[in-house]
Amino acid sequence: RIDHYLGKETVQNLMAVRFGNVLFEPLWNNHYVDHIQITVAETVGVEGRGSYYDQAGAMRDMVQNHLMQLLCLIAMEAPARFDADAVRDEKLKVIRALEPVEPHHIARGQYDGGGDLPSYREDVDNPRSFTESFVALKCRIANWRWAGVPFYLRTGKRMTTRSSEIAVVFQDLGHSIFEGDETRHRNILSIRLQPNEGIDLQVTIKEPGPGGMRLIDVPLDMTFADALDGNGEDVPDAYERLIMDVIRGNQTLF
């Protein structure tokens, strides 16, 4: 089965960021990571897919495929080599290590109508529907690397903004040497899948100007379009990339 999310350039860069940089891999564990958020928010509604969507819901439509694939790429161990079997084996280890999700760690909801926009029940033409168009859940992975680190997954339709992002939130220092600084500053690695594909690293710096050491958090921003200086314009989209892989017999992204 093909998951088109895996064809996105930024999703493929997850493995490059993790396993191609000495900076991140030593910190990629429960000693340094506080929690991880995976968000896929859409501004559209079910848009003519009501008969299908009302049977599936957000959990089956998004979580069990797209979000789980992202979770696996974030949490997996380094494969012995970069090929389909080795990558798939490491993903399966993550799936097998997932703890059962407790009912009180799941939130479900539907979008309501407003203005010219219909409600979910109007979109699916089912006034009694209880199928979720939004779902959020807290997952845990029972292995040495991730024990105690919560993974927060959420996805929904008719949200305020369209955004797909993974945020790796690192632990705070626990103690500040700077007098008067009571903010619990955290480094956050944000990987934007859409729109404006790119990577941000939030770091803490001194606020410019006199008056002592006032600290602020600022992003080190890398947007692919800017970093490639136009050289990424001809990069194939997710579906094109996966179709090419099918033709070439490359199953790494399947």
PLM region spans:
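Secretory/organelle targeting and membrane-embedding segments
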Residues: 1-254
